[in-house]
C-alpha cells in the first residue's frame, strides 16, 4: 500500500518545473499522478521545489491545521506552486482543470519517523 509520505509526493511534488509549463499542465498532471481515476479531485496544489526543501518545512513554523490538529507547519519562505482547480465544464471521466501559478508559503501536515509531509493543508 502507498505510504502517506509517498502519496504526498505523488500528489504534490513537481520539482522538475519552476512553474506550470502550459495551460494543459493541470490536465496532464492530475491524470498522470492518478487524481482522476475514480473521480475528479476538485483542487490540488503542486509544489515546484526540491523534495528536501519541502520536507524541511516540517521543522519550520508550527501552526494549527485547518482540521484543528497541531501537526502543521508553514514554510519560512515562499515557494513556487501551481493550484489546479476543476473548471466548470469538467465532468468525470473528462476532468478539466485550470492552473493558477503563485509564489506562496505552504502549510503541510507532518508525521512519522522520519518526520515528513503527509498532507498539503494550505498556501498563504
Curated annotation (Swiss-Prot):
Any one GO molecular-function label of the UniProt entry: ribonuclease A activity
The reaction(s) this protein catalyses: an [RNA] containing cytidine + H2O = an [RNA]-3'-cytidine-3'-phosphate + a 5'-hydroxy-ribonucleotide-3'-[RNA]; an [RNA] containing uridine + H2O = an [RNA]-3'-uridine-3'-phosphate + a 5'-hydroxy-ribonucleotide-3'-[RNA]
Name this polypeptide is given: Ribonuclease pancreatic
Cellular compartment(s): Secreted
Gene: RNASE1
Gene Ontology annotations of biological process type: defense response to Gram-positive bacterium
Protein residues bound to substrate: 7, 10, 41-45, 66, 85
Organism of this sequence: Dama dama (Fallow deer)
Described function: Endonuclease that catalyzes the cleavage of RNA on the 3' side of pyrimidine nucleotides. Acts on single-stranded and double-stranded RNA.
Region of interest called Disordered, as start-end residue ranges on this chain: 1-24
Subunit structure: Monomer. Interacts with and forms tight 1:1 complexes with RNH1. Dimerization of two such complexes may occur. Interaction with RNH1 inhibits this protein.
Family classification: Belongs to the pancreatic ribonuclease family.
Disulfide-bond pairs as recorded: 26-84, 40-95, 58-110, 65-72
Amino acid at each position: 500500500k502507498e505510504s502517506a509520505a509517498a502519496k504526498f509526493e505523488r500528489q504534490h511534488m513537481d520539482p522538475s518545473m519552476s512553474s506550470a509549463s502550459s495551460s494543459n499542465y493541470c490536465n496532464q498532471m492530475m491524470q498522470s499522478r492518478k487524481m482522476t481515476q475514480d473521480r475528479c479531485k476538485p483542487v490540488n496544489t503542486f509544489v515546484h521545489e526540491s523534495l528536501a526543501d519541502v520536507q524541511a518545512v516540517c521543522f519550520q513554523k508550527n501552526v494549527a491545521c485547518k482540521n484543528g490538529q497541531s501537526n502543521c507547519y508553514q514554510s519560512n519562505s515562499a515557494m513556487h506552486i501551481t493550484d489546479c482547480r476543476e473548471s466548470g465544464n469538467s465532468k468525470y471521466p473528462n476532468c478539466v482543470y485550470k492552473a493558477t501559478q503563485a509564489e506562496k508559503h505552504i502549510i503541510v501536515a507532518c508525521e512519522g519517523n522520519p518526520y515528513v509531509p503527509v498532507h498539503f493543508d494550505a498556501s498563504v
